[in-house]
Amino acid sequence: MTENQELQAFDETLKEFLKEPDHFLTSLALVNHLQRTPVLAAQDLYAVEVEGKKVVPVFTNEQDLQSFKATQESAREQIWIERSSLDVLTQLVQAELFGLAFNLKEDGDFSNTTLFASSELIQFINYFTQTLNNLLG
């Protein structure tokens, strides 16, 4: 799978998870992507305010990133690269920011747009990683 295909698979898995968050296999697939598939993120820590909370925007497709940059002037000043979502999560925790915002945009398809509080996302990743480790023994 090419990097672009992996990012597209991440995007599809995120959509599936948001439609059915209690589906065990989709949750495992999402954790797998969070651990191994890079997201599009600012090279340096970059946060925006959403609903009164400071969040770090990350993207699972180029189109949503371009849409965000078109409406967010400060985003156009950033250098956007592929980064590990876990590295971004680590940075935002150290900076005491609220969480990760996936695929922020003002209009269009919101099926892959969500906000994860860092504490909840860490618990989610740890739970499914531990579950998988227990199953694989």
Q: Where in the sequence are the language-model features?
A:
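An interfacial alpha-helical scaffold signature
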Residues: 1-137
